[in-house]
Amino acid sequence: MLTRNSLYLLLWILFDGGLLTPLQPQPQQTLATEPKENVIHLSGRRSHFQRVKRGWVWNQFFVLEEYMGSEPQYVGKLHSDLDKGEGTVKYTLSGDGAGTVFTIDETTGDIHAIRSLDREEKPFYTLRAQAVDIETRKPLEPESEFIIKVQDINDNEPKFLDGPYVASVPEMSPVGAYVLQVKATDADDPTYGNSARVVYSILQGQPYFSIDPKTGVIRTALPNMDREVKEQYQVLIQAKDMGGQLGGLAGTTVVNITLTDVNDNPPRFPKSIFHLKVPESSPVGSAIGRIRAVDPDFGKNAEIEYNIVPGDGGNLFDIVTDEDTQEGIIKLKKPLDFETKKAYTFKVEASNLHLDHRFHSAGPFKDTATVKISVLDVDEPPVFSKPLYTMEVYEDTPVGTIIGAVTAQDLDVGSSAVRYFIDWKSDGESYFTIDGTEGTIATNELLDRENMAQYNFSIIASKVSNPLLTSKVNILINVLDVNEFPPEISVPYETAVCENAKPGQIIQIVGAVDRDLSPAGQQFSFRLAPEAVIKPNFTVHDFRNNTAGIETRRNGYSRRQQELYFLPIVIEDSSYPVQSSTNTMTIRVCRCDSDGTILSCNVEAIFLPVGLSTGALIAILLCMVILLAIVVLYVALRRQRKKDTLMTSKEDIRDNVIHYDDEGGGEEDTQAFDIGALRNPKVIEENKIRRDIKPDSLCLSRQRPQVEDNTDIRDFIHRRLQENDADPAAPPYDSLATYAYEGNGSVAESLSSIDSLTTEADQDYDYLSDWGPRFKVLADMFGEEESYNPDNVT
């Protein structure tokens, strides 16, 4: 190591002295370069600046990576021309790794690496060196920068960063067809030696594929590899550094290669003849069988198209491809009939949809097979001669008239007789009948075209030998019209004419309607009735298009002379027999302005422009009257409700004055009238009469406070009094009450005041004994409560 570094120093000296000139300078690998010049001021020795050549004898050092020696690895030596070997110069080191990775001998300038280095972790270190005077600590040279490069060794194997790989190549490809390019990377220094020079090779996958040693491009090595023989290939690729030489490191990866399909195989039928059996009753469009051609290709290259080759019976059948199974589905295009033809033979061709022109030389990509179809006999229902029967009949045709017939036949071998009947689910059974054997249809009722113009029902035919086999056909019967109704004028029946009308003015256009409906359409004619032809005020102008105009014949009309005119119009139709009717048009004379706008006529004429008739006006007036009556009734009820609020709460009750010495009817009489009628909210009782004293007389009147004069209350009482006096069913308010009869209770609650004025402790009920035998029960009850002493209870 020392020898190599000494060689670097020697070469630098030779280059610096001009003794050697580099043939091919490579800046990135320069071992020594010419030192830079700098201006140094030497104080005390020179009075001017002088350019001094710096005396460094190095520029770049190298150190091996992954050094595992026991001693620190020697890197190189720093030296200055000012160092005379007297020990007065001190060398310092700073920068990347100074003190941690690299150390320097301050006296000799020797640099050592104190730990193992990895180039892949850090390829070089930039440091700064300086020579200073030991005594003065002043720099002898400006600080200078140098580089220590980590020299690479082959310590990293190649790696496939994108592996494993997946690739594909079409089958039947020629030799050298491109498949895939693989790439391996080596972390070693590619600029130094062969440590990063990778060479590719195939360890597994020959002889099908090959690889370029330098580029890693994989290509086919065999021609015409068939996917149907083998589809998947696994190739093992190796990448080795050191140019593939012995001792180089290697890495491997797997490449999975798939042969993609091409259309190199035509479809083939597994057999040449297919036999099918089809019942003759199979419906049109139904699938009657399947055939299949086999294609070993895959995907769209295996898609097959089937076609029927024109020939015997091919026009009765059709074939389509099932996209899921690639089978040919044979369908029935026309109905089969065993009695007509019992067997059919035709050819079917199968071909690929997507052809590859590279393989046309191998032959046509299609195959042909024969299909034989046998028709099976089926017992079929009768067949009608027509799919639909249309018949016509005049209305009012006599019952039992035959209007048509239907025919059905049994086409099977050994045909059976056929019976006919009307389908009970249709509406024609009650109006028509059918002969079960002959199939003739006759009327069963009188038909009225104005009631129903068309009948639609079904006829069923069944075989006598097998009634379950039936067929059905629709019957359409049109009822023809007989001209039995005269035409009538269409609305309006009324119109108006202005007083200032001129002769020849059309004041109204009228049309006609006819309940008869002729298939060719009706033609109506209009004219005046014979009685109106003499000196007519109006005339009828027939427009020959089923309308007519009412035309004035006078120069002005007077409302005072005649307000209404009645114009008879004769309308005649064109059917046979001819029908006509006379219709009367009412014409009202109205006052109009110069433009013909009606100004005044009558209530109805005002609304003529908007199309309101007399009935509509009457309905509007009736609604207005009903609405007014509802409003008046509502107001009256509101006022009556305000007058009736003369009563307050239920507690304001006026007690009746009862004679207790009367042996009368009792409390049942008091229940027959409404006590609420005597309630008065404005009466306020200031004092109540004590009931615990003996009354002065047998009948005491209740003391009532003065009531202010109120006219409303007085009128109310008098009115109620008169009503009850006039009512013989009303109970008398002054009826006698007999308390010897224990009634159902009194709503007046006249005796409740006995226990409502004071508490039991404050009242003395001895006076009840003085009132006589009638109050003995009350005296005993309250007297016992008064004398009750709980201490005497044993």
UniProtKB/Swiss-Prot annotation:
Three calcium ions are usually bound at the interface of each cadherin domain and rigidify the connections, imparting a strong curvature to the full-length ectodomain. Gene3D superfamilies: Cadherins, TCF3-CBD (Catenin binding domain). The chain crosses the membrane at residues 610-637. Glycans are attached at N256, N456, N537, N545. It comes from Mus musculus (Mouse). One of its GO terms (biological process) is homophilic cell adhesion via plasma membrane adhesion molecules. GO terms for molecular function: calcium ion binding. Keywords: Calcium, Cell adhesion, Cell membrane, Cleavage on pair of basic residues, Glycoprotein, Membrane, Metal-binding, Phosphoprotein, Repeat, Signal, Transmembrane, Transmembrane helix. Its main location: membrane. Residues 55-609 are extracellular. One of its GO terms (cellular component) is plasma membrane. InterPro entries: Cadherin (IPR039808), Cadherin-like_dom (IPR002126), Cadherin-like_sf (IPR015919), Cadherin_CS (IPR020894), Cadherin_Y-type_LIR (IPR000233), Catenin-bd_sf (IPR027397). This is Cadherin-12. Residues 55-160, 161-269, 270-384, 385-487, 488-609 form the Cadherin domain. It is a single-pass type I membrane protein. SUPFAM superfamilies: Cadherin-like. The gene is Cdh12. The modification Phosphoserine is found at S787. Residues 638-794 are cytoplasmic. Pfam families: CADH_Y-type_LIR, Cadherin.
